[in-house]
Amino acid sequence: MQASTPLADKLALLISVPTIRLDYREPAKTDICASDIIAAFNYLSYTYSSTNFVLVGWSFGGSPCFTVAAQEPERVRGVATIASQTINTSGIKELNPRPLLLLHGADDLVLTSACSETLYRQYGTGGEKELRLFEGDDHGLSRNAPEAECMLLVFITKALGLEELLDPGTVEMAGKDFVESREERVREMEKGHDLERGESLNYDY
């Protein structure tokens, strides 16, 4: 497990949802990463009596999230991804009708937005799904991070059945940058080499 992120901070502070950001033992190995997620479920169940979970995966992280969603239909209440890959994501076909949120930068140079468009189609019909492409944005959604975090917080809250917590003030706060949020995002992306292959950050907004 790793330290908190801006989204995790918002979930904890604004709607009191216990959150874990995983540092996978073997990154890019879907089966092992899926086992890590299951272990995190068990930890949260033991520590906080959590029974329902929403998974959020970034880039490769979409793969183990969809895998676990297929394996745990009772515990996983929804899945959201940011700039997901399509390799090893067949579990998305078993997610329906549980809700799905796909976010992607239209100018992503690491994994093109066509990946999320493909996942949107593979989810099928009959469930609740949303695809949002951010024009001019990159693999880390660096130009629209606060808005993306707000969308994720609202999605997670609704998927957990906690809509009553989404008052206007909470939603407004979810769309703001917390102290050092930008710097934290940059550090995490650089650590994971997610700004390579020509990617760059642009905070001119």
Give each language-model segment a name.
Residues 1-16:
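Short, surface-exposed "cap/lid" segments of acyl-processing enzymes
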Residues 3, 28-48:
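Alpha/beta-hydrolase active-site loop
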Residues 39-97:
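Primarily recognizes the serine-hydrolase "nucleophile elbow" in alpha/beta-hydrolase
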Residues 95-96, 101-104, 108:
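Short beta-strand/loop motif that positions the catalytic acidic residue
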Residues 107-111, 139-140:
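Acidic catalytic loop of the alpha/beta-hydrolase fold
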Residues 112-122, 146:
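Short alpha-helix in the alpha/beta-hydrolase fold that links the catalytic acid
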Residues 122-140:
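Catalytic histidine neighborhood in serine/cysteine hydrolases
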Residues 137-149, 173:
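Catalytic histidine-centered segment of alpha/beta-hydrolase-like enzymes
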